[in-house]
């Protein structure tokens, strides 16, 4: 599998002020292990991912693995957090880029961008973990708080990325409904082998774009710069 969102050889961190070469090397090794873990989740599934497979994929010794993660449960917990953070970073990066020069937040285009993100291996791994957690109590206990943290962070970042929309009385329900609906459609299309560009899917997406735009119509005349200025003034 070759995909830029998951790599067993991630870009290495550069030494920063206050950090020694050894500290940076340790962080690089940890990151490489986490990337390799996500790769293994994607390739072999959760239950077939072993620390031996991860260490081999990460090209680190068993000793290095044990230094960072003495137990598989610790590795899984860190990998789940790493997965969620990668999804959040991807979401923020792409949606900020989309709206960089926009006067008003591009709602329909934003829904399309998020939909494309749900076709990535990152979301497929998330689905793999959800299914595995149904019969794995330890994974379930790990996922539950991580999912809550993800949802809080997703909502918080959405308010920052879409300053004008965040002023709407319907902002929370609009963003939550969009995420839940798109994730549900993505799971359905993946499980049935249906194309994300099928007429069936596109018809639903068109309805969602129109519905969400309608929910946020109360702030349609407020531009992004005005909203950001108002937010800045309220903090003073």
Regions inferred by a protein language model and the residue ranges of each:
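Helix-turn-helix
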Residues: 32, 36-74, 78
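Solvent-exposed, amphipathic alpha-helical segments
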Residues: 32, 36-43, 90-94, 125-129, ...
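Residues in soluble alpha-helical coiled-coils and helical-bundle/repeat scaffolds
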Residues: 70-74, 78, 134, 138, ...
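N-terminal intrinsically disordered/low-complexity leader segments
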Residues: 1-28, 39, 191, 217-236
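Hydrophobic alpha-helical connector segments
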Residues: 78, 91-121, 174-178
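Amphipathic alpha-helical packing segments from all-alpha helical-bundle domains
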Residues: 88-89, 93, 116-127, 137-164, ...
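Hydrophobic/aromatic-rich alpha-helical bundle segments in the mid-to-C-terminal region
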Residues: 140-144, 160-236
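Short, basic, alpha-helical segments at the C-terminal edge of helix-turn-helix-like DNA-binding modules
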Residues: 81-87
